[in-house]
Amino acid sequence: MNATEQAANGDRGTTRSAGGRLRYLLHAPGACQLMGVHDGLSARIAVAEGFEALWASGLCMSTARGVRDSDEASWTELLTLVGTMTDAVPGVPVLVDGDTGYGNFNTARRFAGRAERVGAAGVCFEDKVFPKMNSFFGDGHQLAPVAEFCGKIRACKDAQRDPDFVVVARTEALISKLPMEEALDRAAAYAEAGADALFIHSRMNTPQQIATFMERWEGSTPVLIAPTTYHTPSVDDFAALGIAGCIWANHSMRAAFAAMRDVCQRIRTDRGIYGIEDQVAPLKEIFGLFDYEGLEKDENCYTQAPDLAAVQG
């Protein structure tokens, strides 16, 4: 029984791979939540707080690398960061934001293959041309031809090793201010090409575009969204529309950004740290998250001198 069949039968049993677990979540009743992360620390925190799946955000990883979300970081750099996430939270599904696939079908399938090898559950590619700009900045978002993008999807599906590895197709038609018909047509074409899930993106400040899309969507392929700008509805509200998953794409990084900026300002202004201790995490919380006590126990176990008398009989 594959992960899709498990979800249909209400079976929450473990699956063989991270891809299988993500596939299960996308087909289970309701809308799953994927927390945006950018490194091993943010992944550990998200999982410790109960998230069952993670989104390795291109914006957040690029920002953590100190560059813009405009394909300035190489895909090998980003997948190195993804590896820190899968190492930090083994078994937890990580869906990787693969931007446009960094070129043609060949670079897209190479990206997907490398993501699979570092332990990711799946990849998501968007239908803009390379190089891209972040969807929430500016208006110059040119889309790739449908046939070209479908070729990327097919190439990735043909090359995957794990049958449960998830390939998500993201359309930027609404971001590019194209008609709803264009978004629906592209979604249908991408599903036909083999996409395991669809990501419908909007930057309106209400969910109306998403609601309209779901009312008119006749396919069975799961639909993901990232409600970054239309942030009033709850997960349950989106589930009622038929959404399979909500991606909280960049909130962890933005929270860290604000906290780091504020503490830097405070220390510089106060010329000391006497006023910030109650605003930062205690070291014991960090030691606890990374199981320092476990390491100490292992040291006692593995570095004690052997009892030579016992060894010699």
Curated annotation (Swiss-Prot):
Reactions accelerated catalytically: phosphoenolpyruvate + H(+) = 3-phosphonopyruvate
InterPro entries linked: ICL/PEPM, PEnolPyrv_PMutase_core, Pyrv/PenolPyrv_kinase-like_dom, Pyrv_kinase-like_dom_sf
Pathway: Secondary metabolite biosynthesis; bialaphos biosynthesis
EC number: 5.4.2.9
Active-site residues from the entry: 69
Keyword Isomerase found: yes
UniProt-listed Pfam families: PEP_mutase (PF13714)
GO molecular function: phosphoenolpyruvate mutase activity
Keywords from the UniProt entry: Antibiotic biosynthesis, Isomerase
EC top class named in words: isomerase
Any one GO BP annotation for this protein: antibiotic biosynthetic process
Similarity annotation: Belongs to the isocitrate lyase/PEP mutase superfamily. PEP mutase family.
Biological role stated in the UniProt entry: Formation of a carbon-phosphorus bond by converting phosphoenolpyruvate (PEP) to phosphonopyruvate (P-Pyr).
The protein, known as: Phosphoenolpyruvate phosphomutase
Organism from which the protein derives: Streptomyces hygroscopicus
